[in-house]
Regions:
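N-terminal catalytic or cofactor-binding beta/alpha core of small enzyme domains
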Residues: 1-261
Length: 261
């Protein structure tokens, strides 16, 4: 098993938002990380008194995802919107009506508990992303949004057969093209890696990218979810640094090829 990352501390939303669009003024990049930490805000700690094992597991957060997101944002000169509050409080990658928006540790009654969580943690995060995307499109730019995640190597007793997954909507040509270029570039740089399309989840599944697709045309918004196998997450290890470098360099290469197309 990889060395487990320490819990991420800090505000529930960490955002750096330069008004930058990388090297192509026609394109605006946005990087997000919905499951970057397992922090429990003080007012809700009593609810999680017996949930430490879940908080420290893949259920609590996505180990490594925030590290990758920060590096992606620096490389793209892009705004980063990232959450360090545990997904067990509220899952920022779920639509508002999703039945698993809250975990079993958040009681449904009285209703003001969940309403307060959504008001303090869910809505500000989602609005921040929505505002960044809408503002860029309003300026006539095409938005490329990369949402950084990681996945547990074994789920429900089944071994996940991939090192990296690139998730997209097959019905949106821009996402298909960029994903294909990214995957090809990554496999060329790191042929030992198994890189899969729409795995371990489908790109059309309920999530932040899927939500944004509903509100923006395919010509204006490209939403890609990056999924990295958590078995590679090993802080301080050369292999983990090399994987991150390959992911970022291959995306840069894919974007350059797209610009020339």
């Amino acid at each position: 098993m990889p060395a487990r990352q320490p819990p991420v501390r800090g505000d529930h939303v960490a955002s750096t938002a330069p008004d930058a669009t990388g090297c192509d003024a026609r394109v605006a990049f946005v990087v997000s990380c919905e499951h970057g930490g397992n922090r429990v805000p003080p007012r809700y700690r009593e609810l999680f008194a017996r949930a430490q094992a879940a908080l420290d597991s893949h259920r609590g957060y996505d180990p490594g995802a925030l590290t990758v997101a920060r590096q992606l944002a620096r490389a793209l000169v892009a705004p980063l919107v990232a959450a360090t509050t545990t997904r067990l409080l509220v899952d920022l990658n779920r639509s508002p009506s999703h039945r698993k928006l809250h975990s079993e540790w958040i009681p449904a009654s009285p209703p003001d508990i969940r309403a307060g969580i959504r008001a303090r943690h869910y809505l500000p995060y989602r609005r921040r992303i929505e505002d960044l995307v809408a503002a860029s499109i309003g300026r006539g730019q095409r938005v490329v949004h990369v949402s950084s995640h990681s996945f547990t190597p074994v789920f429900d007793g089944v071994v996940r057969n991939a090192d990296v997954g690139i998730l997209y909507d097959p019905g949106r040509p821009g996402e298909v093209a960029l994903s294909a270029r990214w995957i090809a570039a990554l496999q060329a740089r790191a042929p030992h890696l198994k890189v899969r399309r729409n795995y371990p989840y489908t790109g059309k599944s309920d999530g932040l990218c899927a939500w944004l697709r509903r509100h923006h045309a395919a010509a204006d918004y490209v939403g890609i979810e990056l999924e990295v196998n958590q078995r590679h997450v090993a802080p301080g290890r050369a292999e983990w640094r090399a994987l991150r470098a390959a992911i970022i360099a291959s995306l840069a290469e894919a974007l350059e090829l797209e610009k020339r197309a």
